[in-house]
Amino acid sequence: LLYGLMLRSGNDAALMIADYVGGDVDNFVLMMNKKAKEVGMKNTKFVNPSGLDKNGIGNYSTSYDMALLTRYAMQNDIYREIVKTKSYVAKSNLKTYVWKNKNKLLNYKYITGGKTGFTENARRTLVSTATYDGMNFIVVTIRDSDDWNTHLDLYESAFKNYKNYLVLSKKNYNVLEDKYYDNLYIKNDLYIPLTKSEATSLISHVKLERIRNYDNTLVGHNYIYLRDKKIYDMPVYAKKNKDKVTFWSKIKGLFR
C-alpha cells in the first residue's frame, strides 16, 4: 500500500491506510493535523488523507510547511527507502503489477526522494530531496508547470553557492572558558550549509545553568544565530565535577 501510495499517488491506498491506522478516516485526519502541529507546520490544515479537493475545498498548506513535513519524514528509514525507489513489483494471486515512480527527478544522481502531486486548486506540485557533498536539500514548488526544470535549476544553484561549514567541533570544543564548570563538551559536530556571506554572519551564544553537582549533565545550550535569527540549539554538557582540595584539607590529611 505504501509503495502504491508514494510511487503512483494511489488515493485508494491513502484511504485504506487511514482507515486501518486511525480506525476511520475522520479520526486519521485528526491525527494528521495533530502531527502537523508537532512538526511545526503553522499554516496547514488537512481535511482528508488523499489531498484531493472536494467541492472546491481541500487541504491547504505552504511550501515551507511541506518542507518541514518532508524533513521529518526523511528521518524514517522505511520512508527514505520507498521514495527513492524507481519501480516496484507488486504481486497478487491473479496478477503482477509493476509500479513506476512518477518522480522523474530520480534520474538525477543527487536526488534521494520526493513526491509529485496535482489538484485543481494547487495545480502541479512537487517535493524533492537531494544530497550533495554531505548536505541535504529540500525543494518544494506549487503551481509550477515547469517544476522538473525549476527543481534542477535550484539544486544546481545551491550546490554551487553552498558549502557545509563546521560551526561547532566536538573534538575541539574548548573555545568557552567558564570558571564554574570544568570540561564542557558537546556530543556531536555541527555542520551547517551556508553561503560565504552567511558564514561570516554567524553569532555563537552560550547560556549555562548553574548546577551544583554534575556528571555528564546537560548544563546549557550553545545557540547559533544568523542575522539575529536563531538557527540551531546545541546542548552543552559538563563532565563529572571533582571535589576541590583546599590548602587546609591537605594539612588536615597529614595528621590522619
Feature roles, as predicted:
Residues L1-A67:
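Active-site-adjacent loops and short helices of periplasmic peptidoglycan-processing enzymes
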Residues M41, K45, I57-R256:
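Domain-terminus/edge residues, biased toward the C-terminal soluble/receptor-binding domains
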